[in-house]
Amino acid sequence: TPAIVTQAGARRFPRYALLLLCGIYVFSGFIGRDGWKSADMVALGIMSELVQGSAHWLQPSLMGMPANEPALLPYWLGAWGMQIAPAWSAVDFVARIPFMLLLWFAMMATWYGTYYLARHPQAQPVAFAFGGEAQPKDYARAIADGGVLAFIACLGLAQLSHETTPALAQLGFSALLYY
């Protein structure tokens, strides 16, 4: 059934508040913590072995054992981060930076994908007989803001968003497909 939304119901969510919430969510999970899950530690170990030259870049492994995940790009991103890191920086933190960017990218792609989907004429709310319905742009922004908030809520339940594992890269690239 079509939505019945007034212009007042589609008022803008403060952009700074949404960006601040997304930034806090991204940074709080990556900054000031050590790897605490075995999958996180294995991924960091594989990246470290790639940097040290102990493993082949096309067949990442940890102590001779092949990686559990058949993904290459996430390990490469972390290893490249480790390679370009200054000597004074913590290697595990630098390996997390590409994953922080992937999570931010997933949030942006979700917002824009939902925004463009909600701007479609078939997704617009019912037009009122005497006006007052939500404008397409405002309605799409409200739906996209809600979509990102729901996305963050679901990520909080899944607990994969703050790991340095291929699952986060899969999430980021899936969000790109959605966009």
Enumerate the language-model features and the residues they cover.
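Loop-to-helix entry region of an early transmembrane alpha helix in multi-pass inner-membrane enzymes
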Residues: 72, 76, 85-113, 137-145, ...
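Helix-to-loop transition at the C-terminal end of transmembrane segments
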Residues: 24-43
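Membrane-embedded alpha-helical segments in integral membrane proteins
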Residues: 82-83, 150-159
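Start-transfer (signal-anchor) and selected internal transmembrane alpha helices
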Residues: 1-27, 140
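Transmembrane-helix motifs of polytopic, lipid-linked glycan transferases
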Residues: 97-136, 148-153, 176
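Hydrophobic alpha-helical transmembrane segments
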Residues: 38-52, 100-103, 142-144
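Extracytosolic helix-loop segments that constitute the early lumenal/periplasmic catalytic or substrate-binding loops
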Residues: 25, 43-69, 73-76, 80-83
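Specific aromatic-rich, kink-prone transmembrane helix
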Residues: 156, 169-179
